[in-house]
C-alpha cells in the first residue's frame, strides 16, 4: 500500500521524522506531500519547497532511514475544500491511504473515499514547527535540539533563521 503524508515541514523536525519512520514500518511506499509549495519567505512559510525537501532528505539520511520508498511531492495550497486532494490525484502516483492529524485533511480525504490513518503524536508539544519558528525569531538556539543536526546545519548554511528574523522585521 502507498500512503500520503501531507505537511508544510516549516521546518522539518524530529516529530516529523518519528512519523515518517512509523509510516515506513507500516506501508510499502510513502508520498511526502510538501504543502504550501509556492509559498516562501513569509513568517508562516519561511522556507521554499525545495529547501524543505532537502531538509527532509538530509534528516532521513542522518538517521539512516531508507528513503528509496519515499516520493517527494510539492503541492500548492487550495483554499477550496477538497481541491488539494483532487490536484494530488491528478499529478501524483496513485495512493491508498492519507495519513494526517489535521481535521480538514482528514475530512477531505474521507469525502474523497480514502482510508485515513491517524499517526501517533510524537511529543507534539515539544516537536512543533510553530514553536521552532518562534524560537528562531527570538534568536533562541534551543530550537537546534528539536530538529535533526543535519537540518540545523542546513538552515544555518542558508541563513534561514536570519531570513525569518528579517521577514519579521519587514512585516511590522
Curated annotation (Swiss-Prot):
Its EC number is 2.7.7.1. GO terms for cellular component: cytoplasm. It catalyses: beta-nicotinamide D-ribonucleotide + ATP + H(+) = diphosphate + NAD(+). It is found in: Cytoplasm. Pathway: Cofactor biosynthesis; NAD(+) biosynthesis; NAD(+) from nicotinamide D-ribonucleotide: step 1/1. Transmembrane segments: none annotated. GO terms for biological process: NAD biosynthetic process. It is an enzyme of class 2 (transferase). The keyword NAD applies. Keywords: ATP-binding, Cytoplasm, NAD, Nucleotide-binding, Nucleotidyltransferase, Pyridine nucleotide biosynthesis, Transferase. Its main location: cytoplasm. It comes from the Archaea. The keyword Nucleotidyltransferase applies. CDD domains: NMNAT_Archaea (cd02166). GO terms for molecular function: ATP binding; nicotinamide-nucleotide adenylyltransferase activity. Belongs to the archaeal NMN adenylyltransferase family. This is Nicotinamide-nucleotide adenylyltransferase.
Amino acid at each position: 500500500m502507498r500512503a500520503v503524508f501531507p505537511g508544510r515541514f516549516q521546518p522539518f523536525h524530529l516529530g516529523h521524522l518519528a512519523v515518517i519512520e512509523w509510516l515506513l514500518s507500516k506501508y510499502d511506499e510513502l508520498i511526502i506531500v510538501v504543502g504550501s509549495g509556492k509559498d516562501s519567505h513569509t513568517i508562516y512559510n519561511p522556507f521554499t519547497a525545495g529547501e524543505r525537501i532537502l531538509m527532509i532528505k538530509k534528516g532521513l539520511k542522518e538517521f539512516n532511514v531508507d528513503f528509496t520508498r519515499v516520493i517527494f511531492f510539492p503541492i500548492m495550497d487550495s483554499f477550496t475544500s477538497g481541491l488539494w486532494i483532487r490536484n494530488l490525484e491528478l499529478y501524483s502516483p496513485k495512493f491508498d491511504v492519507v495519513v494526517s492529524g489535521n481535521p480538514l485533511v482528514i475530512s477531505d480525504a474521507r469525502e474523497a473515499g480514502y482510508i485515513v490513518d491517524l499517526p501517533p503524536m510524537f511529543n507534539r508539544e515539544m516537536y512543533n514547527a510553530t514553536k521552532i519558528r518562534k524560537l528562531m525569531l527570538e534568536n533562541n538556539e534551543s530550537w537546534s535540539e528539536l530538529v535533526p543536526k543535519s537540518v540545523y546545519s542546513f538552515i544555518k548554511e542558508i541563513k534561514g533563521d536570519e531570513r525569518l528574523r528579517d521577514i519579521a522585521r519587514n512585516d511590522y
